[in-house]
Amino acid sequence: MDGHDSEDTKQSTADMTAFVQNLLQQMQTRFQTMSDSIITKIDDMGGRINELEQSINDLRAEMGVEGTPPPASKSGDEPKTPASSS
């Protein structure tokens, strides 16, 4: 009877190991798919940003203001230094 219990334990351990390996493989595949999707979306957003920047520059050139800096942000992200205000 001990030999039979030992075989059941070994089979149960093998089944659990196979289950966990399969689960980890599925998780890896899903993670890779999501990662690829995120990278693709980030690349697309980067392309759109570049297109928007080019459109803005084209519009500014048409308006004749190409040499002027863009308006300062109102959020205070760019603090003014005394040297730049004189």
From Swiss-Prot:
Coiled coil: 34-63
Pfam families per the UniProt record, alphabetical: HSBP1
Cellular component terms per the entry's GO annotation: cytosol; Golgi apparatus; nucleus
Secreted among keywords: no
GO molecular-function term, one example from the UniProt record: transcription corepressor activity
Region feature (Disordered): 59-86
PANTHER family named among the record's database cross-references: HEAT SHOCK FACTOR BINDING PROTEIN 1, HEAT SHOCK FACTOR-BINDING PROTEIN
Family: Belongs to the HSBP1 family.
Gene name of the record: HSBP
Keyword Cytoplasm: yes
Keywords recorded for this protein, A-Z: Coiled coil, Cytoplasm, Nucleus, Stress response
Stated name of the protein: Heat shock factor-binding protein
Biological processes per GO annotation: cellular heat acclimation; response to heat; seed development
Entry function: Negative regulator of the heat shock (HS) response. Affects negatively HSFA1B DNA-binding capacity in vitro. Involved in acquired thermotolerance but not basal thermotolerance. Crucial for seed development, after fertilization and during embryogenesis.
Localization per record: Nucleus; Cytoplasm, Cytosol
Result of changing I42M: Expressed both in the cytoplasm and nucleus in normal conditions, but strongly reduced interaction with HSFA1A and HSFA1B
Major localization listed first in the record, in broad terms: nucleus
Reported tissue expression: Mostly expressed in siliques and flowers, and, to a lower extent, in roots, stems and leaves.
Region described as Required for interactions with heat shock factors (HSFs): 42-52
Swiss-Prot/TrEMBL induction comment: Reversibly induced by heat shock (HS).
Complex formation: Homohexamer. Interacts with HSFA1A, HSFA1B and HSFA2.
InterPro entries xref list: HS1-bd (IPR009643)
Disruption phenotype: Early flowering, short siliques and seed abortion. The seed abortion occurs after fertilization and during embryogenesis. Differential HSP expression, mainly during the recovery from heat shock (HS). Increased seedling survival rates during acquired thermotolerance (AT) tests, but not in response to basal thermotolerance (BT) tests.
Site (Required for nucleus localization after heat shock (HS)): S35
Impact when changing L52K: Expressed both in the cytoplasm and nucleus in normal conditions, but strongly reduced interaction with HSFA1A and HSFA1B
